[in-house]
């Protein structure tokens, strides 16, 4: 009986750690996206177009590589 209780507590703690890790990852990704979009928002439309064009050329050249 006691061993089962200990095992259940360990399983609950492992599940808690897994859930907290997932939450931290989601929060970090969200903050990263917010930072990226706020940086993009500060650029002008022409700069965004130029960056998108350069990025597209870079990706195409990398794939042809």
Swiss-Prot record:
What main location does UniProt list?
membrane
List cystine links: none
Alphabetized, the UniProt keywords read:
Cell inner membrane, Cell membrane, Membrane, Signal-anchor, Stress response, Transmembrane, Transmembrane helix
Residues assigned to the Periplasmic compartment are: 40-65
Induction per the UniProt record: By acid stress, via the EvgS/EvgA system.
Give the transmembrane ranges. Answer: 19-39
In terms of domain of life, where is this protein from? Bacteria
- Cell location: Cell inner membrane
Q: Which GO terms describe its cellular component?
A: plasma membrane
Q: Show the InterPro entries listed in the entry.
A: SafA (IPR031411)
- The UniProt record lists the keyword Chloroplast: no
Q: What topology does the record note for this protein and the membrane?
A: Single-pass type II membrane protein
Q: State the protein's purpose.
A: Connects the signal transduction between the two-component systems EvgS/EvgA and PhoQ/PhoP, by directly interacting with PhoQ and thus activating the PhoQ/PhoP system, in response to acid stress conditions.
> What family name appears in the similarity comment?
Belongs to the SafA family.
Record text on subunit structure and interactions = Interacts with PhoQ.
Protein name in UniProt: Two-component-system connector protein SafA
């Amino acid at each position: 009986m006691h061993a089962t209780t200990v095992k259940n507590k360990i399983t609950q703690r492992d599940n808690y750690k897994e859930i907290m890790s997932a939450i931290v990852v989601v929060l970090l990704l969200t903050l990263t996206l917010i930072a990226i979009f706020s940086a993009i928002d500060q650029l002008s439309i022409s700069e965004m177009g130029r960056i998108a064009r350069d990025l597209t050329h870079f990706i195409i050249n990398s794939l042809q590589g």
